[in-house]
């Protein structure tokens, strides 16, 4: 499996990525809600796995309970 994205990665920081959706910056991202997570995002490729690929972080994986500002509701 690919390595996990670190919250300290430059790309992760620019997107406000957190490994735990409950820790998202509510000041910077007021539209964030706790039911938003990588696992409910259209970009998440991990299906039901605890972690999976995301096209925004090439060569790395995100955790299912994570979140970033690019979150888009699964269709």
UniProtKB/Swiss-Prot annotation:
Binding sites annotated in the UniProt record for [4Fe-4S] cluster: 38, 41, 54, 68
Domain of life: Bacteria
Gene3D superfamilies per UniProt: High potential iron-sulphur protein
One Pfam short name: HIPIP
Cysteine disulfide partners in this protein: none
Record keywords: 4Fe-4S, Electron transport, Iron, Iron-sulfur, Metal-binding, Transport
GO BP term, example: aerobic electron transport chain
GO molecular function: 4 iron, 4 sulfur cluster binding; electron transfer activity; metal ion binding
Oligomer status and interactors: Homodimer. Monomer at different ionic strengths.
General function of this protein: Specific class of high-redox-potential 4Fe-4S ferredoxins. Functions in anaerobic electron transport in most purple and in some other photosynthetic bacteria and in at least one genus (Paracoccus) of halophilic, denitrifying bacteria. Competent in photosynthetic electron transfer to oxidized cytochrome bc1 complex via the membrane-bound c-type tetraheme.
Family: Belongs to the high-potential iron-sulfur protein (HiPIP) family.
Entry protein name: High-potential iron-sulfur protein
Lineage of the organism: Bacteria, Pseudomonadati, Pseudomonadota, Betaproteobacteria, Burkholderiales
Gene name linked to the record: hip
């Amino acid at each position: 499996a690919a390595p996990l994205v670190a919250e300290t990665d430059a790309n992760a920081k620019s997107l406000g990525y957190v490994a735990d959706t409950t820790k998202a910056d509510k000041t910077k991202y007021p539209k964030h809600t706790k039911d938003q997570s990588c696992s409910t995002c259209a970009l998440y490729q991990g299906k039901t796995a605890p972690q999976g690929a995301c096209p925004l972080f090439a060569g790395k994986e995100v955790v299912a309970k994570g979140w970033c500002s690019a979150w888009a509701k699964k269709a």
